[in-house]
Structures are given as C-alpha cells and as structure tokens.
Amino acid sequence: MDEWVMERYELAKERIAQIPDEKMAEEPYCDFFTKEAMFLQQVIHVMDHGIAGKNLEELQEQNHELYQDILPENYENSYGNPAYAQKMLGEYGKVFTFLYTELHGTIAYAFEKKAWDLTVVLELFLEIYSAFTQEEIPAEKQVKEILVSYVNDYCQDMVENRIREAIDPENNFVVEMIMDSDLSDLSYLYQSGEYVSENELKTAEFMNSLSQREIDEMARTYTEGYRMGFITGRKDITKKKTVNIRYHLGFERMVKAAVLQFREMGLQTVIYRHALHAVNRRNQFRNGFTGGIANPQFDYDHRQDSALFLDPDFVKRKLRAMQTSYDEYADLADVHGGPAVIETFGEKPFSPVSKPESWAFTEAQQKLQLELDNESGQITNRYIKGEERSFTIIAYPIPEIGEDFPEIFREIVKINTLDYKKYQKIQQTIIDTLDTCEWVEIKGKGENETDLLIHLHTLTDAKTQTNFENCVADVNIPLGEVFTSPVLAGTGGMLHVSKVYLNGLQFCDLKLVFDCGQVIDYSCSNFETEEENRKYIEDNILFHHPKLAMGEFAIGTNTTAYVAAQKYNIADKLPILIAEKMGPHFAVGDTCYSWSEDTPVYNPDGKEIIARDNEISEMRKEDVSLAYYGCHTDITIPYDELGSIRTIDDEGDMISIIEDGRFVLPGTEALNEPFGK
C-alpha cells in the first residue's frame, strides 16, 4: 500500500469510527451519517482483517450484513432507495442517495485491497459529514458541488484504472481467486465481496457435481467458439496475447478450465469486475465479472446517477482521460483479443418501478451521453481495433429458473453443442433463396400485429456475393441463424411482440414502427401511462437516440431450443442470445459489422457477405461521429406468434420460407422435427 495513501486511509478510518457516538450532525441527516459510518466500519474491518479463519456460516452472515440494506425486504427504508431518501431528507434526498451508492461500492474495494479506491470514497463521506457538523448546514447546491468535484478530481485516475484492469493480465484479483482456490469448498464464493444468493451457491454446487470431463467439454465449446470467431472472420489470433472473460459468480470450475484452454492458445486471461465508481458506471447493466444482484430495483434506480455531474466539461474530461490512458497502455490494448462472455438466465423477469425521485437525464444530458458513448467507442476502436478483435458469447441457466434446473442445464449444454454442419447446410438453402430476391415480408399471426417489409442489398455478382451470413456456433453460441444488414430505404412497418426480455428487463406488448428503416414510433404496456412506457423504451432500447435504425434482420433456425423452452415453460426467461435463434429477429442500433465494415467476410461456400453496411454506417466515410449508435438490441418474434416469412422478387412473386410458424421451404423440413417430439 502506498505510504501516502496508507496515511490518508488511517486518518479516515479513525475519524469514521468516532461518528456513530458523537451525534454532531442535526437530524434528519444524523441518521444517514450514523448508519453509513457503521456500514463503513464493517467495510474497513474487511480491508484490515480480510476473511481468513471464517467458516461458511460466518461468511454467509457477513455477506448478508454487507448487503442487507438494499435487499428487497429492507429497501423501502434504505437511503439507497431514492424515494425513501427524498422522504426523509427532502431536497437533499438525491445527493445523499448518490453518495450512498458510491459508498456501497467500497465493499468490493475492501475485498480486493484497493486502498486508493476505498480511501477516496471514505474522504468524500467525511467531507460531506464535516459540512453538516457546522453551525449552518450547507445548501443542497453545495453538497452537489462537493460530489461533482470528487468526480472531476478523480476522473483521470478512475478511468485509467478501469482501462488498465480491462487489458492487463497482471495483478488480476478474480483470476487469482479462481486459480488459487479450492473450488470444492464453497467458502471461496465469498472471497470476491460480491453478493452471494442461493443462485450462486447452488450453481457452484451443481458445477461441483459435474465430472472434469463435462466441465472441460463445456469450456471447450466456449473457447473453441472464441478461436473459430477469429478463423471465420479471417483474423490472426496469433497477434493476440489476452482475452477478457466476463462471467457470473458460481461458474468458477468452467472458467478455470477455460483459462487453461486459452493458455494453450497463447492467451492470458483478464477478468475485471463490473464498474462501481460513478465515473465508470453506465446504466444498470453490469459489464464484467459479477455476483448476485441483491436487488435489481436498486441498480435500476441508480441507472442515471451520472445526471448529477454530466455536463460538457465532464465529457471532455473523461474522453481526455480515456485517450491518455489508452496512450499509456497502447501495447496492452494492441494485443487484446476481445471478450469471451458467459451469460446467465433464469431470474424472475424484472419489471422495474419508475421513480421520479431518481436522478434522470435532461434532454441536453441525453445528447451529451450519446456524444460520450460515440466518442469513447471511437477511442477504444483506435486501440483495440474492430477489424482485428473478436468475441464469443454463451449462456447457461441458474437455479432460480425452477425445480427442473439440472435437466434444463443439461438441455442447454446439448443445445450449445448441436451439429453445426447439419444446420450450416440447411441455412445455406435458406440463404440461396433469400439471395434471389430484393424484399422479405414478415407477418405475425393471431394477436401479433407484426407486418414488416425488409429491403435487401442488390448483388452485383450472385456467383461470388451473398447478403446473409451463415451463422453457426462460433462467436454466437448456440447456433443458428442467417442474418443481414437491411437497406434502410424501403424497410418499414410494425414489429410487435407480446412479451420479450431485453438486457435483464421485461417488455410487455412491445411495438416498434419503422419508416425508412428507422424507429419513428413505439409503445409497450409495462406501465399505466403512455409517457412512462415511452420513457422506458427510450431509456432501455432507444438509449435516447431520436431515431434508431434496423441494423439487422435475421431468421433463427434453432427449433430445438424453442421446443425446450416450451417444454420447461422458460421462454420468458431465456436471454436474447438463445431467443434470437428461435424465430426471426430484428436488431435496432448498429449493424453486426460495426467498426469492421471494410473487412471482407465470407461464408463457408466462399461467397463474400456484401451487406455489411447501411446508410447510417456509410456515413463513417464522411463523419465517423454520425455512423454509430453504440447499441445493438435484438428483438425476436417467437415461432408461435409468426404467420409467415416470404421473399418477394422483382416480379412480385413470393416464395415462402415459413408459414404458420413452420419451415416450408424445400430442404428445411428437418428444422420442424423437434416440434413433433
């Protein structure tokens, strides 16, 4: 520990220990400071003494105590709840609930022994506490200024640390935890400081019940998918030295096997935790290693906490910090291969409560956030080049999915390892038909009001070119789909799904209306008012873009996954990674080729996929800031809501690919076999 940081830490620790007994702040503020000082003392104890010597029961008790304040049963009376904070503290509610969230991140810093990260947050707490012990309490504006100064003062350090831990394999806390722990002893789960629920415990127990061969095969499917992503993309994996594993606590046995398999490929593993400092957090999404989510409503309530400090000065400051940090670690960035992601699913679908007391972006801040996302994406791509990196994603269920968890898990393993050659051949039949037409019509059935017309690119040489990628199991596991980037001009109509689960959030009766390939109207039925429903979509699908293009049209072919979802009644719990293979899907946002449009991509038959651009991405040639959205959200129409998919040629003649939810194109009949089982 740096001597200067150590000195500051000791002073902060000593002062915080005095707060619960001195009662120097007035009520109602004294209650906040007393409770948070007591919480911070628990964190400091972990920092100083660790968890050595504690048995499993003691570790579980400690974990519960650290997170109990935001658990659903206690959240109504927590200062982490913006509604409660405002009720108790009035106009100060927003600044105190922001502070609460920043304090909450100290749990992880203590477990990782990140002295600097912990110390600067302790000092922030003490600075605000000190202001409230004076004769005259500070105005809300003054408290906000203290918080903004904290963010601005430490922006460079926090951004630099975040970038380095994403690409530097040295001093990697989570990797060391995995490789050095006895994974048969479930007490290892508590070493990270993440919340441990029954899901994480039972997942680890289940993983321990599998043979080493089963674990190795699961890992091999995943790591080979990553390697094949480079091969099919004609990218040189030998130039790369690191891979970033992102996963959910409980899967350590599989991750350990993957780390060893990546080593055989010449890749060292980097694992970073989801962001905790407000400077680095974005929305409610957790990008990186995570444990259980103690309360998704807490994460949702604080998704726009950056509204406290987001202004033009901060945007410039953060972009400058990113640029200087990537300059500093350019060599590490250049040899980084990209992410290998293990997603989980099975949680009870979450429909959030919208709270006016939460921080929320103004219209001006929405534009600033878009600018920040766009510019930061460009900076990242200059150092971790899109045309040289790849990725892979795979998903597994967690025990919360239900009593059939073991059977469902094994079914998903089977789905993740389907015969790709069989699907590749069938999908080529679909592509050959699609390549004969200029338009595709998609219609729903029953109460599904989908009615879309998709405009395809013109092939100048049908012998060497194709519009659709034949996607089996490499970067996107499981197989299979055929997908393209539509021409926006002429693409339009309504996309409608009765229920869909996107980015951890449930959408009911979702409708998107397209014109010239862009969303021009939208609605859902999650909330009572149209205004709330539109805002929900703006926050979580459109991400505040005035218009969002259809970046992808695809036909999913994994009927085995669909039938399994119906058998176990888990369709509403599947991640889009699997759900997108269970019917046609449409992505709003960037194309699948963003930042690498100029890199030729080929199907197994040798044909070049020429539909890598649309009218938006082509703007990069004139002004790259106009070419990308920084988002890509897939929305699937399940087979049981699907009326038809038909091609339309220049003469207006149609060929059916799917009718009444079943494949009818000659050569695709085998895809219907799972329906009969």
Question: Positions of the model-derived regions?
Answer:
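Active-site and channel-lining beta-strand-loop segments
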Residues: 507-524
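Extended hydrophobic packing segments that form well-structured cores
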Residues: 605-677
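Conserved AWS/pre-SET-to-SET junction and N-terminal core of the SET lysine methyltransferase domain
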Residues: 473-511
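Active-site bordering "gate/hinge" segments
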Residues: 1-489, 658-677
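Dual-mode signal for accessory low-complexity, basic/Gly-rich regions
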Residues: 522-593, 597
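Short solvent-exposed loop/turn micro-motifs enriched in small/polar/acidic residues
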Residues: 435, 503-506, 546, 579
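Short acidic-glycine loop/turn motifs at beta-strand connectors
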Residues: 446-448, 514-518, 650-651
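Glycine-anchored, exposed beta-strand/edge motif detector
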Residues: 582, 588, 596-602, 613-622
